[in-house]
């Protein structure tokens, strides 16, 4: 996206790595990283194919544009179609120029400040991005019930969270969960399968690999 939609896309993509343990989601904003903190006027007017040079038919591209006519986003969607990728457009205008395999129209109406789409339109876009990324990750097996079992244990807070996830998912006490998590190299999903299936972490990892990461199938 460009401007606010681009920042929202980058924000949602950035959260997928720690939450779901995947680097497969990348945010792209017109004007590059500098546009995250500074308005780069004019960046939205043209799309540079180099921004998506590595896009393939195995990918999906989500373009976000409140007006449905931002040149940068329309160019990105066209580039993705040419590459054979799945395309999704999130827009806030009915019948806009944005063309995609899936078009999500959020009819949020006029802004309190006319034209300031960082307000109602941006809020609605973020809600949809949350729902979209979370539902995709659930479908890919990166959650078990309401628990983010692929969480990356990169700090003390997330370590405590991972222990609680293992404890609750496996129905064990905190001491057992802590030991299982340590034995599994900090990987909550592996610890859960090991505890519920009564196997060691190595066998749990093999089961998860066979099940393409889905805890239920691994059990």
Identify the residue ranges that each predicted region occupies:
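Glycine-rich phosphate-binding loops that contact phosphosugars or nucleotide phosphates
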Residues: 2-128, 136-140
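Short, amphipathic alpha-helical interaction segments embedded in low-complexity terminal/linker regions
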Residues: 22, 131, 136-219
């Amino acid at each position: 996206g460009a401007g606010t939609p681009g920042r929202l896309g980058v924000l949602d993509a950035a959260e997928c790595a720690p939450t779901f343990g995947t680097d497969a989601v990348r945010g792209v904003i017109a004007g590059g990283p500098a546009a995250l903190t500074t308005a780069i006027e004019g960046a939205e007017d043209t799309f540079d194919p180099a921004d998506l040079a590595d896009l393939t038919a195995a990918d999906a591209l989500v373009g976000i544009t409140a007006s449905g006519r931002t040149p940068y986003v329309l160019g990105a969607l066209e580039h993705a179609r040419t590459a054979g990728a799945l395309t999704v457009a999130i827009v806030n205008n009915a019948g806009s120029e944005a063309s995609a395999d899936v078009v999500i129209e959020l009819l949020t109406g006029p802004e309190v400040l006319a034209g300031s789409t960082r307000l109602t339109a941006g809020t609605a876009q973020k809600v949809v991005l949350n729902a979209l990324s979370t539902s995709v990750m659930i479908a890919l097996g990166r959650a078990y019930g309401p628990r983010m079992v692929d969480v990356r244990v990169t700090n003390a807070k997330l370590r405590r969270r991972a222990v609680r996830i293992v404890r609750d998912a496996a129905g064990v006490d905190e001491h057992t969960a802590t030991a299982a998590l340590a034995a599994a190299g900090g990987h909550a999903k592996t610890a859960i399968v090991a505890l519920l299936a009564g196997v060691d972490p190595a066998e749990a990892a093999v089961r998860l690999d066979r099940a393409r990461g889905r805890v239920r199938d691994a059990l």
